[in-house]
UniProtKB/Swiss-Prot annotation:
Catalytic activity line of the entry: 2 reduced [2Fe-2S]-[ferredoxin] + NADP(+) + H(+) = 2 oxidized [2Fe-2S]-[ferredoxin] + NADPH
Cofactor binding comment, as recorded: Binds 1 FAD per subunit.
Name this polypeptide is given: Ferredoxin--NADP reductase
Any one Gene Ontology molecular-function term assigned to this protein's record: NADP binding
Family: Belongs to the ferredoxin--NADP reductase type 2 family.
Pfam families on file: Pyr_redox_2 (PF07992)
UniProt keyword terms in alphabetical order: FAD, Flavoprotein, NADP, Oxidoreductase
Length: 322
């Protein structure tokens, strides 16, 4: 017979992991379902060595350190974890039935913490770019790029942050953006301008050259100009953001705003017993930060527990009193 859980969480990224931990503090029986082969979400898989600067009480920590800390926090509790499972359907009711690519699950309440859904890097759209093994979309071991010539493409937080990280160990670091202004946090952009990183704007990549499976140079055209630019490198890093897919989200019967799940101040969706937190949810004024999602997790858990036990207060004891 299928076991029925108090709270099932869809998504094993930072927000989902913290929601699971907090649910255990409320003595809930918890399950996590994630489509990836490991827990941790984007920070663990796509930028394990990238510094994250907006987690309270941590001046800086990497994606892997954040994941390790969250897993250590969760470790003392008995959490059922299902990996490589993708949610395909939700059947609401007193007991909610979840259908995945591997079977069915039953739960009393559901917290969706799936981020932007399945994700993959936006590719460098140059013929043959995927044939070179030194064209990268994420960093798994930054020390292997010490004393190398590095070129970074992009203008957002990842591109700027990685450029600043490479500056500390690389022989040379250059960043190229298609616009004059960067989209990264103002403090990071100012730090970039004060660094030894060479900045080229606004340029659009046009071609790669190399041999034996390794690229050695990239050509650019300057926007609204006849100027050309060619840069040689040992490694090229593409930071154009990510494409995400929400799969069958539209078929789950939840109110959506574009591709996000509409929630109220209790993190409740339009379906009783189902909550959404993190980047997958929408409300007016929503800010997409890990820190924001971490704050939404206790709200969802406490209201889920109140849904299960209407006579109990939504506001629980503080952890300092446990």
């Amino acid at each position: 017979m299928t076991q029925v859980y108090d709270i099932t969480i869809i998504g094993g990224g930072p927000v989902g992991l913290f929601a699971a931990f907090y649910a255990h503090l409320r003595q809930a029986k918890v399950k996590i379902i994630d489509s990836l082969p490991q827990l941790g979400g984007q920070p663990a898989i796509l930028y394990p060595e990238k510094a994250i600067l907006d987690i309270p009480a941590f001046p800086s920590l990497t994606g892997q350190e954040l994941t390790d800390n969250l897993l250590a926090q969760l470790a003392p509790f008995d959490t059922t974890i299902c990996l490589n499972e993708t949610l395909t359907a939700i059947e609401p009711g007193e007991t909610i039935t979840l259908t995945t690519n591997k079977g069915n699950h039953q739960t009393k309440t559901l917290i969706i913490a799936m981020g932007g859904g399945a994700f993959k890097p936006r590719p460098l759209e140059i013929d043959g770019a995927d044939s070179f093994d030194n064209v990268h979309y994420h960093v798994s071991n930054i020390q292997q790029y010490a004393d190398k010539d590095i070129v970074v493409l992009g203008g957002g937080d990842s591109a700027v942050d990685w450029s600043l990280a490479f500056e500390k160990i690389a022989k040379t670091t250059q960043i190229i953006h298609r616009r004059d202004n960067f989209r990264a946090l103002e403090h990071s952009v100012e730090e970039l301008k004060q660094s030894s990183v060479t900045i080229h704007t606004p340029f659009i990549p046009k071609g790669l050259s190399g041999e034996n499976g390794r690229a050695s140079a990239i050509d650019f055209d300057k926007v609204k100009s006849e100027d050309k630019l060619t840069l040689s490198f040992d490694h090229l890093f593409v930071n154009y953001g990510f494409k995400s897919s929400v799969g069958t989200l539209k078929e789950w019967g939840l109110e959506l705003n574009r591709h996000r799940i509409v929630v109220n101040s209790k993190q409740e969706t339009s379906v009783p017993g189902i909550y959404a937190i993190g980047d997958c949810c929408f409300y007016e004024g929503k800010i997409d930060l890990i820190a924001t999602g971490l704050g939404e997790a206790p709200t969802a858990v406490n209201n889920a527990m109140n849904y299960l036990n209407p006579n109990e207060k939504v506001q629980p004891k503080h952890s300092t009193s446990l």
